[in-house]
């Protein structure tokens, strides 16, 4: 991967990914919270696929193949917030802007389990009846049966983060250790977090680009280069520890 270099003048690292510790803390707290555990399937799918928030808001049961464990990304849902008193908040279905956006994403085991959990819940409590631009059968809806909007998801992330951090600080103090603090982040950071984990474990840039749906491979390369920089520091620290000769 020596040919991958950062281009001068590009703004790198503006949207930071969660660390593995932070990601694990966020998901564990969400899944085990009686207040927030119903959000766990949505966040699992976001963190386990790297899909854009609009792609997951718009995903339907017919877009996933549970037998082959594949997700077909072929459209997105855009949320238009109210701009004036006379204008309503609206959703609209849109097609991917580029061919790269139309793709198939394999399900990892936790993602498959999240879909199955959601399916069993809806099988017992009722499936979504929302219709949008002729589409129906949407998987993720709110408690009112409507589609989620990114602003509401971000508010939930904020509540989870604040509740977790408050409890973690007290717990860490009691256990006499440093707390694992979750920083401010939005639903858009979850895509970047997935891509970062992917880059940490995969060296084939084209595979990463295909799964992420990046139209321009430079976008993928930028994230890979950023991860490589972090890995270099970790590798040197590990080497120093293992050598133990200085």
Predicted regions and their residues:
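Short, polar N-cap/turn motifs at the start of nucleic acid-interacting alpha helices
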Residues: 63-70, 203-223
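Gram-positive cell-envelope targeting signals
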Residues: 17, 38, 48, 55-58, ...
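Catalytic-site neighborhood detector that most strongly recognizes the C-terminal catalytic loop/helix
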Residues: 9, 77-79, 193, 212-237
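Basic, Lys/Arg- and aromatic-enriched nucleic-acid-binding interface segment
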Residues: 1-53, 57-59, 66-67, 78, ...
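Short, basic (Lys/Arg/His-rich) helix/loop patches that form interaction surfaces
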Residues: 28-39, 105, 121-131, 135-147, ...
């Amino acid at each position: 991967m020596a040919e991958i270099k950062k281009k001068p003048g590009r703004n790198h690292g503006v949207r930071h990914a969660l660390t593995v510790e932070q990601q694990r803390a966020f998901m564990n707290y969400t899944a085990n919270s009686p207040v927030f555990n119903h959000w766990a399937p949505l966040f699992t799918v976001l963190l386990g696929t790297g899909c854009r928030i609009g792609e997951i808001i718009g995903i339907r049961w017919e877009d996933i193949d549970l037998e082959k464990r594949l997700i077909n990304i072929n459209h997105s849902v855009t949320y238009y917030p109210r701009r004036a008193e006379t204008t309503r908040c609206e959703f609209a279905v849109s097609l991917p802007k580029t061919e790269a956006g139309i793709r198939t994403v394999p399900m990892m085991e936790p993602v498959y389990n999240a879909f199955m959990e959601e399916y069993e819940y809806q099988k017992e409590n009722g499936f979504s009846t929302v219709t949008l631009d002729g589409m129906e059968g949407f998987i993720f809806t709110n408690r009112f049966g409507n589609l989620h909007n990114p602003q509401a998801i971000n508010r939930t992330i904020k509540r989870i983060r604040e509740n977790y951090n408050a409890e973690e600080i007290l717990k860490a103090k009691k256990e006499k250790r440093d707390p694992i603090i979750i920083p401010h982040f939005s639903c858009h950071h979850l895509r970047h977090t997935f891509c970062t984990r992917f880059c940490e474990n995969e060296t084939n840039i084209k595979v990463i680009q295909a799964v992420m749906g990046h139209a321009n491979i430079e976008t993928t390369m930028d994230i890979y280069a950023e991860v490589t920089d972090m890995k270099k520091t970790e590798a040197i620290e590990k080497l120093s520890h293992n050598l133990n000769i200085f």
